[in-house]
UniProtKB/Swiss-Prot annotation:
The gene is SAT3. The lineage of its organism: Eukaryota, Viridiplantae, Streptophyta, Embryophyta, Tracheophyta. This is Probable serine acetyltransferase 3. Keywords: Acyltransferase, Amino-acid biosynthesis, Transferase. Residues 280-301 are annotated as: Disordered. Pathway: Amino-acid biosynthesis; L-cysteine biosynthesis; L-cysteine from L-serine: step 1/2. GO terms for molecular function: serine O-acetyltransferase activity. CDD domains: LbH_SAT. Its EC number is 2.3.1.30. SMART domains: SATase_N.
Length: 301
């Protein structure tokens, strides 16, 4: 079993394709030209971080009560990765058992060793801003959205897992599950531009793969069937939308641009650009757009 699990990631390498990262000036994994962000006084050259800091400053100026809060968690930090490590450490530490400063150093080290995690976090912030009508500012997602925070905890845990540091990776998984109510195994491979909307009750298994530009609502399970070992979890393509309460079980493939209806139980492959309905016996219907990006949930008669 261990050998099988260790071999499968080679078929699903971590990658940052240009179609979901072309708006991020700091993405260096594609040859596609990227228009630079407009220059601004005090700009770091990191578009997402600069925008997030500007939003934080606006909120701090408008609400004096929040000035220290925003200063400590955002405005005093030199980078998105630094701010993220500090914020997650504050939420995941255990007083008297898991010191906040040591946890911050662990998270910061994992993010520094795996810069792809930081690029994915930036794409996740942009996804929340663009797809969630309740998200007025990226800084609100960064500070308050449990789905985003749980996903970034997973990215750090996955970095540690990839470096064969299994014990601290499992520690982060456990704490994220306890604090955020989201359980993602550190072995799972998740692309960028992900929206975990509401997120409570999301479970993603060890050998699951999630593509790019995917939107997942609350109470979704990407799990095994309980009868298999090795590579036993779903493979979700790009631009997929998975509705609330859906369960995708086993080593099945969900094609690019597919939609899994709320409450659906999926036990077999779903073709590209089709909808898997929650009603047993209904055939998958074709989709015209990427539901994971448009966030439209539609079922034809």
């Amino acid at each position: 079993m261990a050998a099988c699990v260790d071999k499968w990631p080679a078929a699903y390498p971590c990658r940052l394709p240009d179609k979901f990262y072309c708006a991020l000036p700091d993405c260096t994994t594609t040859d596609r030209p990227v228009a630079p962000a407009p220059a601004a006084s005090g700009s770091s050259g990191d578009y997402v971080w600069d925008a997030l800091r500007a939003e934080a400053q606006d909120d701090a100026d408008d609400e004096p009560l929040l000035r220290k809060f925003y200063h400590d968690l955002v405005l005093s930090r030199p980078s998105l990765e630094s701010a993220l490590a500090s914020l997650l450490a504050a939420k995941l530490c255990i007083p008297g058992a898991l010191p906040q400063d040591q946890l911050r150093d662990l998270l910061a080290g994992a993010l520094a060793a795996h810069p792809e995690a930081g690029r994915a976090a930036r794409a996740d912030l942009a996804a929340a801003r663009d797809r969630d009508p309740a998200c007025a500012k990226m800084v609100h997602c960064f500070l308050y959205y449990r789905g985003f925070l749980a996903l970034q905890a997973h990215r750090a845990a996955h970095a540690l897992w990839s470096d064969n540091r299994r014990a601290p990776a499992l520690l982060l998984q456990s704490r994220a599950s306890e604090v955020f109510g989201v359980d993602i195994h550190p072995g799972a491979r998740i692309g960028g531009g992900i929206l975990l909307d509401h997120a409570t009750g999301v479970v993603i298994g060890e050998t699951a793969v999630v593509g790019y530009g995917v939107s997942i609502l609350h109470a979704v399970t990407l799990g095994g069937t309980g009868k298999e070992s090795g590579d036993r979890h779903p493979k979700v393509g790009d631009g997929v939308l998975i509705g609330a309460g859906a369960s995708v079980l086993g080593n099945v493939h969900i094609g690019d641009g597919a939609e899994i209806g709320a409450g659906a139980i999926v036990l077999r492959d779903v073709a590209d650009g089709t909808t898997a309905k929650p009603i047993i016996g209904k055939k998958a219907e074709p989709q015209r757009e990427l539901p994971g990006v448009t966030m439209e949930q539609r079922w034809s008669d």
